[in-house]
Amino acid sequence: MDKKLKSKSKFLSLVLRHQPELIQLPLDANGWADIEVLLAGAARQGVNISLQDVLEIVATNDKQRFALSGDKRRIRASQGHSIDVDLQLTPVTPPDELYHGSATRFTDAILATGLQPGQRRHVHLSADVETAHKVGSRHGKPVIFRIDAKALTLAGHAFYLSANQVWLTDAVPPQYLSLLDTSPQG
């Protein structure tokens, strides 16, 4: 994604996940927004984004952060909201292990208190080590945590799989996670 589209994608994340009021954008209970209303609100705030930009961002975003309605007239963020929306997620059984990437500077706090959603609605988890490593690398030197999703499920925690294949749960207490050794062998 080129630099201009990346900036526009960040704008979409901001208004669809966190601050729709910045452009007076009404979201329905499930997080959907009318694209024409979004474009008009963006223009009022001096943000130059077109329908073609929106369609290209949705089509080319490797993380599939956004979804379009069947008629392509509405858009929503797939997950990562700090505002209260119902993404209509159904609990699903996760794989036995999931992973979470973070920066090494957060290791002690995570081991002490577990994973909390912070400003988001859910903790975000990855199905594979590679994805978790990429996530952790965005925040500094990465560290990977292995999550005992099977034990968490047996303890009554619900898991959801977002439209863009990110695993979501309410929290991960410290007894259900461990540091994954990613040092080179040999």
Swiss-Prot record:
SUPFAM superfamilies: ADP-ribosylation (SSF56399). GO terms for biological process: tRNA splicing, via endonucleolytic cleavage and ligation. InterPro entries: Ptrans_KptA/Tpt1, RNA_2'-PTrans_C, RNA_2'-PTrans_KptA, RNA_2'-PTrans_N. Keywords: NAD, Transferase. It is an enzyme of class 2 (transferase). One of its GO terms (molecular function) is NAD+ poly-ADP-ribosyltransferase activity. The keyword NAD applies. It holds the Pfam family PTS_2-RNA. Its EC number is 2.7.1.-. Belongs to the KptA/TPT1 family. Removes the 2'-phosphate from RNA via an intermediate in which the phosphate is ADP-ribosylated by NAD followed by a presumed transesterification to release the RNA and generate ADP-ribose 1''-2''-cyclic phosphate (APPR>P). May function as an ADP-ribosylase. This is Probable RNA 2'-phosphotransferase. It comes from Hahella chejuensis (strain KCTC 2396).
